[in-house]
């Protein structure tokens, strides 16, 4: 079933079968995989009806450019590209405002988009949403939020990576130069949880509690921090700091931004011992380093 000139699949009435409603889905997925316009997981066919439904939650013109030309293809990303990927990923239309904001953020020069879509580092395109829209659409920051079982997290993050593959043509093993890649390149999306936050969330730091913000970062896969014995915030913070730049990680050699996710009990411990968010940030950025002999010739 070749796509139409506009890149969308035609309405596939010929595949409708009352005895087998999903007849043809396997063939569609095989076709997308052959063209390297899928991530290997089953996709929802981006029919015209589904595409138009997705745009109902997007007030922008479908040809509006969200990202400048980048990546191996040298193409720009439009609202249309994002809506198609959102359908394929299984997103609900309510996710469109977050996706549009995410690609506007990816277009910020500080993100270094062109390098991020071809790097050999197996990082994913982390999307962190703060504010009321996250809760309205079901985006989670609760226990297990970066694993399976959270459909909004999974599909929204997946849509971001489908756009990067399909529009920028950052195809694994071709122009995506990861050595073995990682699960973070399938999906990497979660929210700040207001009921669990011990300090202001990102949206409150920059705007207010009624505004929703979308923060993006090219980030390595989850780096677990294990500390069973610390009984005070200072010792716990030292453990966290040491994990932020372990030898062999990018941050040991090329310092960059960090996202530190605190569990509720760790957040409570740090706040109880008098730490503010700014104090935690300052501590990490002061002590997150290695002595020169440790990194020389590595």
Predicted features and spans:
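Non-transmembrane, aqueous-exposed alpha-helical and coiled segments at domain scale
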Residues: 1-298
